[in-house]
Amino acid sequence: MNSFSHVPPGFRFHPTDEELVDYYLRKKVASKRIEIDFIKDIDLYKIEPWDLQELCKIGHEEQSDWYFFSHKDKKYPTGTRTNRATKAGFWKATGRDKAIYLRHSLIGMRKTLVFYKGRAPNGQKSDWIMHEYRLETDENGTPQEEGWVVCRVFKKRLAAVRRMGDYDSSPSHWYDDQLSFMASELETNGQRRILPNHHQQQQHEHQQHMPYGLNASAYALNNPNLQCKQELELHYNHLVQRNHLLDESHLSFLQLPQLESPKIQQDNSNCNSLPYGTSNIDNNSSHNANLQQSNIAHEEQLNQGNQNFSSLYMNSGNEQVMDQVTDWRVLDKFVASQLSNEEAATASASIQNNAKDTSNAEYQVDEEKDPKRASDMGEEYTASTSSSCQIDLWK
C-alpha cells in the first residue's frame, strides 16, 4: 500500500522550483532528514513514465504532475554522458537549461527533457515531459553527471477546444431573420409601395386576435414574440416611408420644366414696311432686348433648378448619393447644350448685325456718289432682309 495515501482530503503537493531545489534537493544531497517526505526515490532508467503515476501518487486526489528523486548514472563507465534510456524509450534533452535564483543568488539549474518511444535516432515523440533540477552555483560551469536530482514529470497539456454544442443557437436564428429583413428592403420601388399595406393588414389581423378588453401594449407584454415582431414592423414601415418620400422628391426633381431656347421673333410686315434707314436700328435694338430678357429668364430658371437640386441633395441622405451624382451629370450636359445653343444664336446675330452695318455704310457711300446705283442696292437689301426674316421665323 502507498504510504502517502492517508493524507487529509484537499491536500495537494505543488512546490515551486525554488522550494524543490533549496529545501528538498539540498537536504537530500546533504543526507538530512525531511520532516514530511512526499518525494520517493525512483530509478528513472528502469521505470516507464506511465508507471510513475501509481508509484508517485499522493492521496486519492487526481494529480497532473508527479515528483521523485533520482540518482544520475553515467552511460559509460569512462564517459561523461548521462544514461537516460528505459526499456520502452529514452529521455532526450531539449532547449537550454534554466537558472533558478533565490534572493538574487543562483541555487540550481533546470533541464527539460521529452520522452521518445523506441530507440534513437528513430524514436517517436510522446506527450511526457520531465523537468530535472540539480544544484548549481555556476551558471556557466560544467554540469555534474553524477549525483542526486529531483524530477517533476507531467503530460503536455492540450489546448482546450470548445465544443460546438456549447454555443447558443438563438443568435444564428436572429441573424437569419435580419438577413431576410434586410433583403426585403432591397426590392423595387413598386414593391416598396405595396409592402406597407401588407404589414398594415397583418397588424389588423393581430388586433382581431387580441382578447376583448386588452389593449395592444398589454397584449404585446404578454407575448414577447409579438412585441419583437411589432418593433421590427414599425422600424421597417419607418424605413419604407422615408424611402418613399425620397423617391417622390427625386421624381419631382427629374420632372423639372424644360428650359426653352430663346427664339428671335420678327414680323415680315415690319421688315418690309419700315423705312430703310430706321428698320435696321430698330430690329437690332429689339433683338438685343429680346436676347437680354431671354438670358435673364434662362439664368433665373437655372438658379431655381440648382436651388431645388441642392435642397434635395442635402435632405436625401447618404442612400441616394450615387443617383444624385448621375443627376448632376445629366444637368451639366443639359446646361452645356443650352449654353452652346445660346452662344450660337448670339454669334449668328452679331454676324448679321455686322453685315447690316457694312451694307449701310456701303449704301451711304454709293448714295453720295451715284444716287441711281444706291436705289438699286436699297431694293436688293430690302429683298435680302425680308428673306432673312422668313428664315429666322423657321428657326
Curated annotation (Swiss-Prot):
This is NAC domain-containing protein 7. Keywords: Activator, Cell wall biogenesis/degradation, Developmental protein, DNA-binding, Nucleus, Transcription, Transcription regulation. Residues 344-362, 382-395 have a biased composition (Polar residues). Residues 344-395 are annotated as: Disordered. GO terms for molecular function: DNA-binding transcription factor activity; sequence-specific DNA binding; transcription cis-regulatory region binding. It is found in: Nucleus. The keyword Nucleus applies. Transcription activator that binds to the secondary wall NAC binding element (SNBE), 5'-(T/A)NN(C/T)(T/C/G)TNNNNNNNA(A/C)GN(A/C/T)(A/T)-3', in the promoter of target genes. Involved in xylem formation by promoting the expression of secondary wall-associated transcription factors and of genes involved in secondary wall biosynthesis and programmed cell death, genes driven by the secondary wall NAC binding element (SNBE). Triggers thickening of secondary walls. Interacts with NAC083/VNI2. InterPro entries: NAC-dom, NAC_dom_sf. Expressed in root, shoot and hypocotyl vascular elements, columella root caps, epidermal and cortex root cells and root-hypocotyl junctions. Observed predominantly in root imature xylem vessels. Present in root developing xylems. Specifically expressed in vessels in the secondary xylem of the root-hypocotyl region, and in vessels but not in interfascicular fibers in stems. GO terms for biological process: cell wall organization; positive regulation of secondary cell wall biogenesis; regulation of DNA-templated transcription; xylem vessel member cell differentiation.
